[in-house]
Every structure is written in structure tokens, then in C-alpha cells.
Amino acid sequence: MTYSPTINTTITAQQTTTKGVALRTQGSSKNESSKRKSKKRVAKVAKDMYQIVTDRIIAALENGVKPWACPWDRTQQCDMLPMNFKTKAQYSGVNILLLWSEIVEKGYSSPYWLTYKQAAELGGNVIKGQKGTEIIFYKTWEKKNEQGEDEKIPMLRSFVVFNLDQIENIEKPVIAVKEDRPKNDEFEILPHVENAILATGAVINHVGVRAFYAPSQDTITMPTQDRFTSSSDYYATLWHELTHWTVHKSRLDRKLTGSFGTKDYAFEELVAELGAAFCCADSGVFGEIQHDSYIASWLNALNNDKKYIFKAASLASKAHQYLLPR
């Protein structure tokens, strides 16, 4: 199976305030020289943000930590992605990785986040001395090209959010731990996950001992459930293959042009691993796919392309949103 993804990025969850790392472009400049300088500064800052985020991902992987592993043991909430407490919007793309990593590093117990202004609007305040977490979004900047036509340029900006654990005077929601969830060593059919998978319309054949998506036939092959030691392993594997399944031209149309062992193949495997992690978190599955054999390839790509993780996480979020629409 060969993979060559399209490059795309998505806007992250809506926020009421931002602290941009890019310079403001509103207002008129006094001369063309100042405009050119402003553009250069914008580009430089955006480039730095890509590097800052990439460096965090590299450091985590080099320390044996996958930043896309949902921190179930911290939040006790394994059926949701990081979410803005005010808007109830899920964060997406690379922001999921940044916020999950922060939960693990700081030991936060809440999956909810707010900006400083949002906390104040809800009657709360950030506890003195607390440091926020910087996440990103894209803003479109319009300019005229050489033909005099409007051209839209995506500009990377950042803003700061705080975990609900860092905020006082806001009533925190009680997170109910579902005791009926199967443990890692138990196999139990999860009806809500089965229904979600059925709703995708994917053709899934249970036969043999390998799990794979066949693009030529547009079908998924899975071992029978009794071959898995736990339902978590089974559903995590199936979400992984379903993420591959979204490449089809009738769905998300990711281009497949490589073969096993190529950089493009490793990239698609990262997209599928991230997509499976997002779907597991959103559907209450504890499972995690182990693809450690690809880590060396991913690290090499991350060191050579600061936008690599942004592209993969964006495509994974698109797959997750396709498979589990809200």
C-alpha cells in the first residue's frame, strides 16, 4: 500500500481571545518598505512557532513518550478530546498533542481549557503564578498578487490557554468514571463503538491474522475478535485501519503514491496512528497501537521538516471528524 498525503491544515477550536506570535497586519502602513519589513517579521515568527512545536514533539519521542497517547490515568476521562470549557469545542490537529503532553507533564486532572479572558467572563480567575500553554491557529491574510488578484495566505499565530486546574472560582464539572469500561485484559463488545463503526459504511471482513486496508478493493480486513487479547486492542486496531480507509477519493482523497518502507508510507502510518488515537479518545477506548518501528523514520522527518507533525495531525483530525462527526 502506498501513501502520499495532501498538505492541508485546519483551524483549531474557536477562542474569544488570542495572543498572536505574528504581527498585526491591520491598518495602513506609511510606505512599502514598512510593509515588506512587516511581512518578513510575520514569516519569521510563524517559522519559529513551527520549530517550537516540532522540538517539543521530538523531545517527547526521544524520551520514549508518544505525545498522541491520551492521558487516561490523569483525567479519568477517556471519551473526549481536549475541549474548551466555555465553547465546548474540541481542539484539533497538533493542539491535541500539545494539550495532552501538557496534561502528562504537569499532572492536570481536567481535559478542559480556557483563555485568560474566558476564565474572567465565567467569573473565575487564573491562579497567581500559573503559566499557560501556548497553542496555535491559522489566520488568513489577504494581499494582491502580481496580477492584481486577491491572494489568501495562511498565517500561523498562537494564543495561551489554561487548564481548569489552574483556574479558581469556577465550578468544575464532576467527571464520572465509567466503571463498566473493559480493562486492558478483558474483551467486551462496546455497543456505542460498534454503532459508530457501522455508521461509517466501511466494508470490514473478519478473516485471517492480519489487519489491513486494501485500496484496490476499498475494504478492510481484520482478524476475528477472539484473536485479540482485549476489546481495546481490537477497536484501536480497527480505528487505525478506518483512518487508512478515509484516503479513498470518495472520502478525504489523500493521494497514495509510495510503497512499504518509503517516507510517504511512514507518513501515512503516522496519520493513521494519530487518527486512531483521536478516535479512541472520542469513543472511550483505552487502546493504543504500537508502531515503534516507525519512530526512527518519524524522528528523521521531524528533524528535516518543521511542518511534518502539523500536516500529519491536521490530516488525522480530518479523518477523525469524518469517522466520528459531531
Language model regions located:
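N-terminal accessory/interface modules of nucleic-acid-binding and processing proteins
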Residues: 2-326
